[in-house]
Design a protein with these regions (language model features):
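Extracytoplasmic/lumenal domain signature
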Residues: 1, 36-67, 101-136, 168-207, ...
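Repeat-blade elements of multi-bladed beta-propeller folds
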Residues: 3-35, 68-94, 101, 137-170, ...
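Short Asp/Glu-rich motifs
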Residues: 95-96, 125
Length: 220
């Protein structure tokens, strides 16, 4: 049984369906035990065509860890037909905690479309003995609310800290994206730009708020 909690939901209308179709209106939500659900907004039933009978295990690819060290704490973000999720990490407990990977799934099928592993540019991903790529452990995480801009096709991530919060002697550049706003291409997950608010953050400042947008006039 999933453990639900009051962290918000995302709502999406499938324009390829009619109002009488199942899952015309989808409610997407994460749980504190790290599952992502797609729910029919009319009936409350799981959308069986999403993931594994309506759910996705967000612990997939994170490696062995204490279940209390990774969980969903914010509503998913939606842009186009993608649902994008980060996750909260117990990043002040140990350096050996799950990574802060951000993943984009097809909102209809639950297929993983892309992922962003917040490792420094040039660092090689981890490959296990079976040739499977694993997400880097202890990296910067995105626990707060993600913003999207359909016009620019960008996803804006407010990042937290690299584990462990208050000591950085071991990091060796792994905090490259910590305490930053990171803009990703919504179609590919590639970094477009990022701005780091605190370099080598050992104070657990994070970027705790959802990025917001406004237009300004330059030079009058």
């Amino acid at each position: 049984k999933a453990i639900m909690h009051c962290r918000g939901v995302a709502s999406w209308i499938d324009i390829e369906k009619t109002k009488s179709d199942k899952c015309y209106h989808r409610i997407i939500t994460g749980t504190i035990d790290a599952e992502l659900f797609s729910i029919d907004g009319k009936t409350g039933e799981l959308c069986q065509d999403f993931g594994e009978n309506g759910r996705i295990d967000l612990r997939s690819g994170l490696g062995d860890h204490n279940p209390a060290f990774y969980y969903s704490v914010s509503p998913p973000a939606i842009i186009g037909d993608l649902v994008i999720v980060g996750g909260g990490i117990a990043d002040n407990v140990s350096t050996s905690v799950p990574g802060g990977v951000v993943r984009a799934y097809d909102i209809r099928t639950g297929e993983l479309i892309w992922y962003w592993d917040p490792i420094p540019p040039g660092q090689e991903p981890i490959i296990d003995d079976l040739g499977n790529q694993l997400y880097q452990r202890g990296t910067t995480n995105v626990w707060s609310i993600i913003s999207t801009d359909p016009e620019l096709n960008l996803v804006y991530l407010p990042t937290g800290n690299t584990a462990a919060d208050n000591y950085g002697g071991h990091r060796n550049g792994s905090d490259y994206y910590s305490s930053s706003v990171v803009a990703l291409n919504a179609s590919t997950g590639e970094v477009v730009w990022h701005f780091q608010t605190v370099h080598h953050d050992i104070w657990d400042y994070d970027v705790p708020s959802q990025p917001t947008f406004y237009d300004i006039k330059k030079d009058g």
